[in-house]
Amino acid sequence: MGCSHNCDSCSSHCGGEKSLKVAANPAASVKKVIGVVSGKGGVGKSLLTSMMAVGMTRKGYSCGVLDADITGPSIPKTFGVHGQLEGCEEGILPARSEGGVQMISINLVLPHEDDPVIYRGPIIAETVKQFWSDVVWDDVDFLFVDMPPGTGDVPLTVFQSLPVDGIIVVTSPQDLVSMIVGKAVKMAKMMNIPVLGIVENYSYLACPDCGKHISVFGESHIDEVAAHYELPVLAKLPIDPKLAAAVDAGRIEDAKLPDELSGALKTVEGLL
């Protein structure tokens, strides 16, 4: 029998590595999958993920968030979503925020929101896969995947198992930025995942009296780092106490998003 040139459906295993992609739920519809990653924690990755979903929703797109940070989930609280997930014959139904953002998170499965998730790596990886394969995502234009920091099990699982169309690397203005960005970018390139660009969070604080930009965490090095890796800087986002308060209250959909986010939103919009 001749070769069909479709290695995924072939049982001969003669064409190199077999795809590790996990099939989506047959009843689900997702057009684009965007990963949000960081080389370290504390850079506002989940905040950016939430802002991207809100920003694209305000542009008229249907958005979802897959909270892949299994041991440190924060997406439901940011959107003020509580309670347990529900299911149907086709699979798990994602929760929805007041603004219509669909989401799946381990915190929507736990009996209590403050219960710890004490899973080993393989169980965490399988949970992330199920968030893709078992969930009935309803006509989602952009699915943002909020990943834990680093280059461990979850980013590897997402890159191998989900049809990721690109990632956004989140960092902060510190001297460690080059190494941190480098790890995330190199991992993505090793996995053949497109890097859409870099977002610098907590870039500055605008003085409420005079508007002067105060570099709370030191001078930014993001332009040099981005040039080194030949990547665009999608945004330099300020520290915004009002936005932080909205997140704490679960009201991010009511918050004013920073104007500086427009570049990142435009880049993602261009994928459709």
Which role does the model predict for each range below?
Residues 1-24:
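Cysteine-cluster motifs in flexible loop/terminal segments that predominantly coordinate metals
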Residues 63, 68-113, 118, 125:
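Phosphate-binding loop that captures ATP/GTP phosphates
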Residues 32-70, 185:
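Walker A/P-loop phosphate-binding motif and the immediately C-terminal alpha-helix
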Residues 142, 148-245:
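Conserved catalytic-core segment of NTP-binding enzymes
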Residues 110-158:
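Phosphate-binding/switch loop-helix module in NTP-utilizing enzymes
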Residues 247-258:
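C-terminal boundary of histidine-terminating zinc-finger modules
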